[in-house]
């Protein structure tokens, strides 16, 4: 990835590779992040259901902006299509509006491009901005051994790992989107299309309380190895995850190794708040007004990430 960072003209605060870039504007900083829905779009096409991928687009961007302590405020979207399809575009827009309202942001512009011969079907991405006071930026540099990890539950796969999920469930196992999930009242398709959880309300509530937060992580592609984006020189012992959603167990049953599962998927935790042990209970009390959360582990000083799996074994990265 090429990243041009000329500090002669702009005061850039974060290093490349963090969840969002920060540029200082006086005593404020603007946070910027861009992301897309990825191959989850193929599930939408299989189901002929397009009114939720816009929520995924919003979520992938705003959840990343939160990770530097910024409150998301606005987004522009980019829809690239093989051929114009007004009905599909209207469904996609419906999801974008839903996600924007839930995140309390404005969609201030966008672009729709028809690219026959370049793109197949469609692709959807967004770029968002947020603001934060410079003295309230959270980069992860304050993380230290002994800190606790508070995990906020996911509602399923979110928007990462769909290449592996499709291979395991459809190519290898031969399931269809209409097959019933084990131990659930939903189909496989319904579980796969479920929109990504939006974490704006609970995390912004923490910002307003001005709790001592050392790090924030959106658990996306890469699973818990995303924690390495926050600070070098520390590790994480994750020993008490919530029950993994059934969709992950079904994928695992198709001979996907646990080491790969926990490196690709969120495995039931979509967002992590890192704080001191003394602050954890207060933070969880606020979070529980919005979502399910629990202490899932601690920060260590050995640079390894160790995760206790739902089978009781451990995987290390």
Say what each PLM segment does.
Residues 2-4, 273:
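Short, small-residue-biased leader/transition segments that mark boundaries at the very start
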Residues 5-8, 255-256:
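Short Pro/Gly-enriched beta-strand edge/turn motifs at strand-loop
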Residues 8-155:
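Glycine-rich phosphate/pyrophosphate-binding loop regions near the starts of catalytic domains
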Residues 41-42, 159-161, 227:
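Short helix/loop capping segments that flank catalytic or ligand/cofactor-binding pockets
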Residues 53, 160, 195-198:
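A generic structural signal for residues located within well-ordered alpha-helices
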Residues 88-106, 119-122, 176, 182-193, ...:
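Glycine-/charge-enriched secondary-structure boundary and capping motifs
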Residues 137-184, 188:
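Short, acidic (Asp/Glu-rich) active-site segment that either coordinates a divalent metal cofactor
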């Amino acid at each position: 990835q090429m990243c041009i960072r000329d500090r002669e003209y702009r005061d850039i605060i974060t290093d490349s590779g963090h969840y969002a870039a920060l540029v200082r504007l006086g005593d404020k900083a603007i946070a910027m992040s861009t992301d897309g829905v990825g191959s989850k779009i193929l599930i939408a096409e299989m189901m002929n259901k397009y009114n939720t991928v816009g929520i995924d687009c919003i979520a992938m961007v705003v959840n990343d902006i939160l990770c530097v302590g910024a409150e998301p405020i606005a987004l522009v979207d980019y829809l690239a299509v093989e051929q114009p399809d007004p009905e599909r575009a209207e469904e996609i827009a419906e999801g974008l509006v839903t996600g924007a309202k839930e995140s309390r942001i404005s969609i201030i512009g966008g672009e729709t491009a028809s690219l026959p011969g370049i793109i197949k079907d469609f692709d959807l991405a967004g770029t968002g901005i947020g603001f934060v006071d410079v003295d309230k930026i959270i980069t992860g540099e304050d993380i230290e051994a002994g800190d606790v990890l508070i995990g906020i539950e996911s509602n399923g796969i979110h928007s990462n790992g769909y290449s592996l999920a499709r291979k395991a469930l459809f190519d290898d196992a031969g399931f269809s989107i209409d097959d019933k999930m084990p131990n659930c009242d939903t189909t496989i398709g319904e579980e796969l299309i479920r929109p990504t959880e939006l974490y704006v309300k609970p995390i912004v509530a923490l910002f307003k309380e001005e709790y001592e937060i050392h790090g924030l992580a959106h658990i996306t592609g890469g699973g818990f190895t995303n924690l390495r984006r926050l600070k070098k020189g520390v590790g994480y012992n994750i020993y008490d995850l919530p029950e993994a959603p059934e969709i992950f167990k079904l994928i695992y049953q198709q001979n996907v190794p646990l080491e790969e599962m926990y490196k690709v998927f969120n495995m039931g935790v979509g967002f992590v708040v890192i704080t001191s042990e003394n602050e954890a209970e207060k933070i969880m009390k606020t979070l529980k007004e919005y979502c399910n959360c629990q202490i899932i582990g601690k920060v260590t000083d050995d640079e390894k990430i160790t995760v206790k799996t739902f089978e009781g074994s451990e995987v290390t990265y």
